[in-house]
Amino acid sequence: MRSYLRFSDRHRQRPTRPRKRVICSSAHFICSRMSPAATAQSPFGISLHSLSFRLLLIFRGSIVAMSRRFVYKLDQAVTAALGPNGRYIAMVGMTASAVLLTFHYKFREVIAATDNVAEIQSPSKLFYLRLLFGRTRSRITGSVMNINIMPALRDPIYRTLASVGGIDTEEIRYPLRSYKCIGHLFARTLKDKEREIEDIGTQSLASPADGVVTALGDVSSERVEQVKGATYSLRAFLGLMPKVTNPEKNTLKFVVLHLKPKNYHHFHAPAKFDVNVLRHMTGETLPVFSSFLKRFNDIFSVNERVVMSGNWKYGCMHMVAVAAYNVGNIRIDKEPSLRTNELRVVLRHLGGDVETRTYSRQPFEYSVGQHVGEFRLGSTIVLIFEAPHNFTWDMKPGQEVRVGQRLGGVGPIRRAQTEDERLFAFY
């Protein structure tokens, strides 16, 4: 009987041995991953590596007991807060958090591997913004906007949208019921004489779109204001750093125009402008309204955009159409094959290529006010151009403008003398 009891005691003690081996293995693993500095001698005459290993072995019982108490207390707290099924909810939450953190880590790893081509100041913020305002959600909204509406329902639906959104139905070229879907309504054309060129002189700059001036000024560094209080990298935004051809007489200037949903969604040439290069940079579709831009840097340099680079009277000019949330579609009249917000493409700031089209032999020649392209549901136009030091702005941030209205220029306004000079086509 005694031998049996002794055998039973030995048998009951056996399960404790693997636990000791696990703790020893864990301690060895932790210590083996310590930095080389940890192998230095401690005040006790042994290396920190060995000292840590021995301390873990000495206090292994306390560590196990503390771990058990922590798990027990955590389980009690979760059950009290979330009910009997709280532990399962917590498990799902912790799993989701682990997956999210893994994707976050991988996103930052990709940004670092591509040498941060967009010069993003906070990759973590961008990651979580992508979760909220992803390209897929913009495409879904675009699909909904392009659903055909029954002719009998178009007039009441469009009039409700117009009254809520502040759309002026009197200036729309065609009857409301002629627009098949909401997307077509936002891409509407205007009646003749609804917009005029205020200054036809070659020394001035006309507004390329209806909207609000959110920022303007001189380019003094590689980072430019997208709105007061937030900046973006000009080099990443354009794909190059623009240079002033005549630094003694000229300087680089910029202006940002935000198109609201109620605005006319087409954009026009701001001056007599020859386009030599067109660059399409794939990107996000993050919101571009002022209150959002104030809180986050680098929105312009990561959003999808089409950059038209060329020359005007005083030197270089870059006209950039920036996509926004629910506005993945950017259409350029002279490049009908251009497609934006496409599926399964590598975004520029994640290492994707820039689609470049050059027209050095036969550049696109635009006259002031000539139609260039259109958005869907509002977005942003950015102008970066070379101008003389005595170029003055006629507008201020926060001021609303209309197509053809003078943004600034050199000297007095030159008014149109004939009907042909004053009007331009919206077709």
From Swiss-Prot:
UniProt catalytic activity: a 1,2-diacyl-sn-glycero-3-phospho-L-serine + H(+) = a 1,2-diacyl-sn-glycero-3-phosphoethanolamine + CO2
Transmembrane stretches, start-end: 89-107
GO CC terms, sorted: mitochondrial inner membrane
Active site: D210, H268, S379
One GO BP annotation of this record: protein autoprocessing
Positions of modified residues (Pyruvic acid (Ser)): S379
Molecular function GO labels: phosphatidylserine decarboxylase activity
Pathway: Phospholipid metabolism; phosphatidylethanolamine biosynthesis; phosphatidylethanolamine from CDP-diacylglycerol: step 2/2
Subunit description: Heterodimer of a large membrane-associated beta subunit and a small pyruvoyl-containing alpha subunit.
PANTHER family: PHOSPHATIDYLSERINE DECARBOXYLASE (PTHR10067), PHOSPHATIDYLSERINE DECARBOXYLASE PROENZYME, MITOCHONDRIAL (PTHR10067:SF6)
Name recorded for this polypeptide: Phosphatidylserine decarboxylase proenzyme 1, mitochondrial
Organism: Toxoplasma gondii (strain ATCC 50853 / GT1)
Gene name in the database record: PSD1mt
